[in-house]
A protein has these predicted regions:
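General beta-strand recognition
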Residues: 5, 14, 23, 33, ...
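Secondary-structure transition/turn motif
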Residues: 9, 57-60
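Short, charged beta-strand/loop "edge" motif centered at a coil->beta-strand transition
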Residues: 19-50, 95
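C-terminal boundary/linker segments immediately following FHA domains
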Residues: 59-60, 65-107
Length: 107
C-alpha cells in the first residue's frame, strides 16, 4: 500500500488513495494547523499524484524542504516532489533554531 506520513508536534497525518490531500496552515480549517506566525493561514498542501506526493506552497514566507541526503530547498508559490523522507519548515529555514517543522516519510 502506497502511503505518506507527516508528523508534526506529536501528531501523525497519513495520506493515501482514500486521503490524497493534506491542507497546511494557521487557519483552523486546515487539517494540519501550524502554530508558527511565520506560516500563512493557508500555507499549502501535500497532495498525492499517482505514486508520488508533492508539496504545493501557497505561502507568503515559503516552505523550506530538506530531503534525505540533499541540501535544503526554499519553495514559494511552487511545488516540489517529496520523495523518501525529510523535513518541511514553515516560513523559516531549518537552520533557524526557532523554525517550526514537520517530518515526512514516504512509506
Amino acid at each position: 500500500v502506497d502511503r505518506f506520513c507527516v508528523r508534526y508536534h506529536g501528531k501523525a497525518f497519513l495520506l493515501d488513495a482514500k486521503t490524497p490531500i493534506l491542507t497546511l496552515g494557521r487557519d483552523l480549517a486546515c487539517k494540519l494547523v501550524i502554530e508558527d506566525r511565520k506560516a500563512s493561514r493557508k500555507h499549502g498542501r501535500i497532495e498525492k499524484r499517482g505514486d508520488d506526493y508533492y508539496l504545493v506552497d501557497m505561502s507568503t514566507n515559503g516552505s523550506f524542504v530538506s530531503r534525505s541526503g540533499q541540501p535544503e530547498v526554499m519553495v514559494r508559490h511552487q511545488e516540489i516532489l517529496l520523495g523518501g523522507s525529510g523535513r518541511i519548515c514553515f516560513g523559516s529555514s531549518s537552520n533557524d533554531p526557532m523554525a517550526d517543522c514537520a517530518d515526512f516519510e514516504h512509506l
